[in-house]
């Protein structure tokens, strides 16, 4: 209790860590470089709701600013400096700023890449003898290519890839679904946060 944590990143991971840290009575400052929380994964109304929830739980939220420098004291982390020049002092930091797929093995095999390992609707790569699934795989979804970083996608896609490795011809039909637990609130999202007509 009482320790100061600096959380860098206002996506699901950053917000979930903030909620747990507050339950443990830590002082929490969260920095998000985008103009709002959950920018890549949720609509502005959802982001606003969760911003208010965290502020009601005494999380200091800074949006639209980036970390430009880390502060060291006696060889240990002591905080960070924002692009505004403001110094944020903390005892430790947690960084959750997105997912970049690790594709060096696929690249070394000469596989086609497209924001991850490019797969078709059967989870096959550009080499039909190699299949891929999970957070590293970019797959066709409607009129675009998509890479989902979620447990549900990883499990369902792996099941399809395994069946196809055994000789089946099963198509992967993504049904994007996400959840997040923060304080006593459970968020569940079905679908994607772009291309919608209205928020209900």
Where are the language model's segments positioned?
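Short glycine-/acidic-enriched loop or helix-start segments at secondary-structure transitions
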Residues: 17-18, 40, 72, 103-106, ...
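Rossmann-like dinucleotide-binding cores of NAD(P)H-dependent redox enzymes
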Residues: 4-6, 12-69, 150-154, 174-179
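Generic secondary-structure signature for well-ordered alpha-helical cores
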Residues: 23, 55, 59-60, 72, ...
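Feature captures the FAD/FMN-dependent oxidoreductase FAD-binding
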Residues: 69-76
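FAD-site-proximal beta/loop scaffold in flavoenzymes
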Residues: 1, 76, 81, 86-163
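Mid-to-C-terminal Rossmann-like scaffold of FAD/NAD(P)H-dependent oxidoreductases
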Residues: 136-200
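Well-ordered beta-strand scaffold positions
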Residues: 66, 85-86, 185
């Amino acid at each position: 209790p009482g320790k100061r944590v600096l959380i860098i990143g206002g996506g699901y991971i950053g917000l979930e860590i903030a909620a747990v840290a507050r339950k443990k009575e830590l002082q929490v400052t969260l920095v998000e470089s985008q103009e709002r929380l959950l920018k890549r994964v949720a609509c502005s109304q959802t982001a606003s709701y969760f911003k208010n929830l965290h502020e009601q739980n005494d999380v200091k939220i800074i949006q639209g600013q980036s970390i430009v420098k880390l502060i060291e004291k006696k060889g240990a982390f002591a905080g960070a400096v924002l692009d505004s020049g403001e110094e944020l002092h903390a005892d430790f930091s947690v960084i959750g700023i997105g997912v970049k797929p690790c594709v060096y093995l696929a690249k070394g095999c000469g596989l086609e890449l497209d924001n991850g390992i490019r797969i078709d609707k059967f989870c096959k790569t550009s080499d039909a003898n190699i299949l891929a699934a999970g957070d590293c795989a970019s797959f066709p979804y409607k009129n675009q290519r998509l890479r989902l970083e979620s447990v549900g996608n990883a499990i369902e896609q792996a099941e399809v890839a395994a069946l196809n490795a055994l000789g089946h011809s099963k198509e992967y039909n993504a049904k994007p679904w996400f959840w997040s637990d923060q304080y006593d609130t459970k968020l569940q999202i079905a679908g994607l946060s772009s291309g919608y007509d209205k928020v209900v």
